Regions:
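Short loop/turn motifs at secondary-structure junctions
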Residues: 39, 73-75, 117, 181-186, ...
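Conserved alpha-helical substructure of the radical SAM core
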Residues: 2-105, 109-113, 317-328, 355-365
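Radical SAM enzyme [4Fe-4S]-AdoMet core and its adjacent flexible, acidic
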Residues: 119-120, 124-126, 130-276, 309-310
Length: 370
């Protein structure tokens, strides 16, 4: 079947139209600062020493950077760190000119004034209060509790829940608290960069986590911004005949010589994308690594891009196209690239469709023959 035939479905046509009207997204990521107010166990930023040799840019460099990116055609920025909430003034400047999504640990509230629009806020959580305190708060700081307080009912906010493989039983109670707080949830998956092992070891797989995610989708279909398809691709590292790794990753700095050979291998990538260090003058290999082994990367942001840039692989059936289209739609909705208030009403229907069982063709053939 062709794309035109799939779009005869009114719901798919609506989703597709919303994405087309948003226009082409030209994105980058940037470290707003090289400093942070906590140290999470296994944080990719400090584990790969991304703070070393790239001090936070001066105001003059920051202003020049924004102007340069506007001229280059950038219209969407993923803001990471260090900890971006430490620089609220710079967040306001970014939101004046770009749509943006910021990742925060939640300890310091990002103010509302001057940041009412053009900004989505992903709040990190890694498990229940005890696990989060141990993994992110140094065993002392109740970051999850503070973040719940800071972002209660905040329309800009969603939870960016990094699931640790051996702690799948915590997913449902944590999501209950997030939803009760008035915030939707997107999932990420933990890479054991500190070699903690045992329950934290990503090599044990995320099958139990996926099952728990599917259960919270059933319970809160309007509040979970990850589909079963996205969850499977990210946590297994499989996309059709491709296995996740540097050779297929689509989000890397195209101006950095370390990636020039990768750009020649025929696999799709985003030609505009760059991952800027905190000095805003240099780029690194990709969003989440300098020398990191990509086998430990379960970053949902980069896997979103992997799926999105592989449309052709998803044209074999209406179900496959639906997997692709709903992935794109989720990314656009989370980041307010489409109208958020009307778009979020489609989330429950997206989950309903993706939870439908695909008919077993062999069984149907046997029935027809009898």
């Amino acid at each position: 079947m062709a794309l035109k035939e799939y779009l005869q479905d009114p719901f798919l046509k609506e989703l597709y139209g919303s994405i087309r009207r948003a226009g082409k997204i030209q994105s980058i990521s940037m470290d707003l600062t090289h400093t942070c107010n906590i140290r999470c166990t296994g944080c990719y930023y400090f584990n790969d020493h991304m703070d070393v040799g790239h001090p936070t840019a001066s105001e003059a460099v920051f202003d020049a950077f924004l102007q340069k990116e506007r001229e280059r055609g950038t219209n969407f920025i993923t803001i990471v760190g260090g900890e971006p909430s430490l620089k609220p003034g710079r967040l306001r400047e970014i939101a004046r000119y770009f749509k943006a999504s910021v990742s925060t640990n939640g300890l310091k509230k990002i103010p509302m004034k001057g940041l009412e629009k053009n900004l989505s806020i992903g709040i990190s959580v890694w498990g229940d209060a005890q696990t989060d305190r141990r993994m992110r708060g140094g065993g002392k700081i109740d970051i999850f509790e503070k973040a719940l307080e800071n972002y209660h009912g905040d329309p800009r906010a969603f939870w960016y829940y990094t699931v640790i493989p051996g702690y799948a039983s915590q997913i449902e109670p944590v999501v209950e608290r997030c939803v009760a707080n008035g915030n939707p949830v997107l999932f990420n998956f933990y890479g054991d960069l500190k070699s903690i092992g045992n329950r934290a070891d990503h090599r044990r797989g995320f099958a139990e986590a996926r099952q728990a995610i599917n259960r919270v989708v059933d319970r809160f279909p309007h509040m979970i911004y990850m589909t079963s398809y996205i969850s499977e691709v990210v946590s297994t590292g499989r996309l059709y005949d491709q296995k996740w790794g540097y050779e297929v990753c689509t989000s890397f700095s195209t101006d950095n010589p370390v990636n020039f050979e990768r750009m020649q291998n025929g696999m799709p990538y985003s030609p505009h994308f760059r991952a800027y260090n905190a000095d805003l003058q240099t780029t690194r290999r990709c969003c989440t690594g300098i020398d990191r082994d990509c086998a430990s990367c379960f970053d949902v942001w980069q896997h979103f891009s992997w799926i999105i840039l592989n449309l052709r692989k998803h044209l074999g059936s209406k179900r496959e196209f639906t997997n692709w289209l709903t992935t794109v739609y989720m990314f656009y909705l989370i980041n307010r690239l489409i109208d958020y208030d009307s778009g979020k009403k489609n989330i429950a229907e997206i989950h309903r469709r993706l939870c439908e069982k695909t008919p077993n063709i062999a069984v149907l053939d046997n029935v027809a023959a009898s």
